[in-house]
């Protein structure tokens, strides 16, 4: 990468993750987009010709890492409220088929990038069928992985589904770059047959593709996988698809089918037992923890403490705005802290410094990117986020970490940068036309609305 000016970012607080917080700190970014130095403001003299970016009463942190989102579903915010999970999915799928075009997905994905940048998210793992996020990430200048979904609950569909997946992935990979990668996502146990899971895993291993799977998310999924009944079973049987009682959990099933050999990112993982947790740890799998969406859909709370204690890589995800309504990783971290403190009956579980790690370096580890991003260290890419702590709801600041996660909001973000390139500053996304996108979103949503009831 070239063309990025030398920059010194200065802020009232610099929170490197890999080192203690710095009062009146600075980060020097080289022309290669990498961090050259981190230290007290007075110790970093701007090189000749360097641009100095003064951030004032802000906390400068690594760019936030959202390990699970559905950007193509940005038009569904507020349109799928108070539904049972099966009905939520059926209404979502029906509306997509009836109302949305490829152009709508392009608009939705770009709108999701606008929201993400405004919330300080610089890296995003997108799980979707359209693949629209690949172009949206590139245009926005963000970093990410696009997990292209595949579906097929009928075993007879497996070969055709894999062939279609290969074609789509090959097209997406032609646009890969240092910042944007492509993976695959056999969607979930209620939409993917055993045969398709196994074939997708073999394909991923052969091609070196990262894998993401929605897994152990709901009681309905549990009932289908273990007992062969529950909310999903009647619809599958009506299509002539058998729903055998496996007598094993989703994690056991994925292990038996070879999916865990891919060291996948498993999304949600609410319904795990102790054996499942150990199995994930042994396999080197990662988990996308989505506390807000899991709670709003009534699924419950993932066993995050047990996963961490077992050594499983866990990052935070916002899921779609159809299930969460907001793409705010600071809020996601705060909710995670509240839920798990309540569950553990412990007022000091997940302190603010661990929340910072959870939505930066831990997220990078979950996506296999920890050698490049997730902390402010010389040699790493300068993916940055600055959060103002000057608003009344954040002051006074006795502890910048506590202020960041227990008082500040995603709307307090004042800067987002990737490899030193500023993508968002003081209310304005610099790489996308937010005003035009907003008008396009409203027009598409008006057409979609009639299909959501």
Sequence positions of predicted segments:
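Active-site microenvironment of metallo-dependent hydrolases
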Residues: 1-25, 30-36, 357-453
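Divalent metal-coordination and catalytic microenvironments
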Residues: 12, 27, 33, 57, ...
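Alpha-helical scaffold segments that flank or form the walls of functional sites
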Residues: 59, 77-141, 163-177, 440-451
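Active-site beta-loop-alpha junctions enriched in small/polar residues
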Residues: 70, 129, 149-153, 185-189, ...
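Active-site gating loops and adjacent loop-to-helix segments of metal-dependent hydrolytic enzymes
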Residues: 75-107, 114-117, 141, 145-154, ...
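Histidine/acidic residue-rich metal-binding segments in metalloenzymes
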Residues: 135-136, 162-286, 298-314, 371
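His/Asp/Glu-enriched, well-ordered alpha-helical/loop segment
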Residues: 256-259, 263, 302-391, 407-408
